[in-house]
Amino acid sequence: TGASLGQQGDAVSEIVREIKKAISIPLFVKLTPEGGRIAQVAKALYAAGADAVGGTANRLGIPPINLDDPGQAIYHLQKEISMSCYSSAWLKPLALRDTYEIRKVNGPGNMITATGGVRNYRDAVEMFMCGADLIGICSEILRSGYEFIGDLIADLKKYMDIHKISDLLTGKLT
């Protein structure tokens, strides 16, 4: 699976090197958090030429089981139970940890994308403090609509003005 391959820095580095040979645009690599070696794999990918690396804002789990037909998946596009990806606010502490570990091991010169559980400007500031250069948001936009983005940016600017912050505090905790 992608999750098991993503734990092998040498294998994923080979893929990154080949992609970099074929493209002329920046390459952002989204890592699997499964396996617990995310910072070390990120290090190998930066060495292979990745322009940015980030943790995946989800975790694998078993979806709810249909108690009336346990072998049938609850998702209509699948015939049987399989792993599903879970994300949203509960994941933020894990996403912060992944971001922090990637920054701590790889230093300030490497771009990090962070995703997982950002629902307001405070969550975004925490991601930046743990080392993010860029933040990805999905679940909250799906829940609240695109206007969420403008609100988040306005609140972030207000926070920065109040605290007289001119940059995004990237890596403040590392």
Label every model-predicted segment.
Residues T1-A22, L31-T32:
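Metal-dependent enolase-superfamily TIM-barrel catalytic cores that perform enediolate-based chemistry
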Residues T1-D10, V41-A42, A48-P108, S144:
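Glycine/Thr-rich beta-alpha phosphate-binding loop at enzyme active sites
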Residues S4-Q8, K30-E34, S84-L91, T113-G117, ...:
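Glycine- and other small-residue-rich loops at beta-strand/loop junctions that grip anionic moieties
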Residues V12-R17, A39-K43, T99-Y100, A124, ...:
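Generic structural signal for well-ordered alpha-helices
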Residues K21-T32, K104-T115:
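Short beta-strand/loop segments at the ligand-binding rim of alpha/beta enzyme cores
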Residues L27, L31-L45, A57:
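Internal active-site segments that recognize and position negatively charged phosphoryl groups
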Residues A48-P63, G117-V118, D123-D151:
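Glycine-rich phosphate-binding active-site loops on the catalytic face of alpha/beta enzymes
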Residues P63-M83, F128, S139-I165:
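C-terminal helical cap(s) of enzyme catalytic domains, especially alpha/beta-barrels
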